[in-house]
């Protein structure tokens, strides 16, 4: 989800996950701990009153850190198919948090009251052990192709961590305060040597069911609905399919957009604006759901 204004003079935004940098007994940096949730908050811009709407589950990243002869080895373990939550703010000012575990919606209404609506029917796909292993193998193959196309990718990641641990600028979305930093444009003196590698969780750590949606799946239209871009559980021709969910938590429509189109925005009365790339030109198209 993204931050949004609405008519009651409130600003809704997503906070940052808790991040704790640990130190070993020897005084060297240890593996940081990153929370797997982050808050969604609502602030009244007139009264400055802030409410925590709830917490959304985000992808869990496990970071390992070891030190050998002055060289730090960083391992970043990620889950390529995480079960997460999504959120959006409707045109009526209601905040919807869509839960990935069972696909239901927790609401904070515009007047501040809260409610939860029923689970949304979904054709859940069970992931067999073979499915999980094939997915991890496929993701690794994609990573290998990307690394071959950009040989300096891992080196750039390692340099970013070297800067952090030597007192320079941190990588995006990482905040740490450590001694030894200095100003100026060059790398800090005494910057440690860091090797950073991205790995993936074991297939057995993947969910037994394919998630209903990925991150950034939620969009609010101009008619009070939340559009959820779902993950297909069966081969489907055409573009992505969206569940259109009303304020009662009911799917009132399922909309498939054409291939190579992306939703750019909405208009009242079921109007959808789609963007389409044609070479170097981006075209905006107007369509109706009905």
Give the positions of each predicted feature.
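Eukaryotic scaffold repeat domains enriched in small/polar residues
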Residues: 1-290
């Amino acid at each position: 989800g993204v931050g949004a204004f609405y008519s009651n003079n409130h600003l809704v935004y997503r906070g940052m996950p808790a991040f704790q940098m640990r130190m070993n007994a020897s005084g060297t940096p240890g593996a940081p701990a990153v929370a797997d949730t982050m808050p969604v908050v609502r602030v009244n811009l007139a009264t400055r009153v802030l409410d925590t709407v709830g917490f959304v589950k985000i992808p869990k990243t496990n970071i390992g850190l070891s030190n050998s002869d002055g060289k730090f080895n960083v391992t970043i373990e990620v889950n390529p198919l995480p079960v997460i939550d999504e959120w959006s703010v409707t045109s009526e000012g209601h905040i919807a948090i869509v839960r990935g575990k069972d696909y239901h919606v927790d609401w904070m209404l515009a007047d501040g009251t809260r409610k939860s609506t029923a689970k949304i029917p979904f054709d859940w796909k069970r992931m067999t052990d073979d499915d999980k292993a094939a997915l991890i193998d496929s993701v690794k193959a994609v990573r290998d192709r990307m690394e071959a196309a950009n040989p300096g990718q891992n080196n750039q990641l390692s340099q970013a961590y070297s800067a952090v641990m030597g007192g320079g600028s941190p990588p995006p979305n990482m905040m740490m305060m450590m001694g030894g930093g200095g100003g100026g444009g060059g790398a800090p003196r005494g910057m440690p040597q860091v090797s950073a590698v991205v790995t993936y969780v074991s297939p057995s750590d993947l969910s037994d069911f394919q998630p209903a949606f990925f991150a950034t799946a939620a969009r609010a239209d101009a008619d009070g609905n939340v559009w959820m871009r779902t993950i297909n559980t069966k081969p489907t021709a055409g573009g992505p399919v969206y569940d259109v969910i009303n304020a009662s938590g009911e799917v009132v429509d399922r909309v498939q957009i054409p291939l190579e189109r992306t939703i750019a925005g909405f208009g009242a009365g079921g109007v959808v604006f789609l963007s389409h790339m044609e070479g170097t030109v981006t075209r905006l198209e107007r369509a109706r759901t009905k």
